[in-house]
Amino acid sequence: MSAPWTLSPEPLPPSTGPPVGAGLDVEQRTVFAFVLCLLVVLVLLMVRCVRILLDPYSRMPASSWTDHKEALERGQFDYALV
């Protein structure tokens, strides 16, 4: 005798989604590769910014400190406000 609350075994309906072994199509692979490249560039920029923040003066050449000093002391500028 079967209990009224149990269900009789019925076959499951066929799945309407993509097959389990289906891979990505060409457009999805292209977008995935593009996003991956953007993430790599973002990580490289973040590493560079952190390195500059930790030691800002090591990346700056010493000549840039003295090139424009004489012109500024004389009151000459590269541009003039009219």
Swiss-Prot record:
Tissue-by-tissue expression: Neuron specific.
Membrane topology: Single-pass membrane protein
Superkingdom of source: Eukaryota
Main location per the UniProt record: membrane
Disordered: annotated span: 1-20
Keyword Oxidoreductase: no
Family according to the record: Belongs to the cortexin family.
Protein's recorded name: Cortexin-1
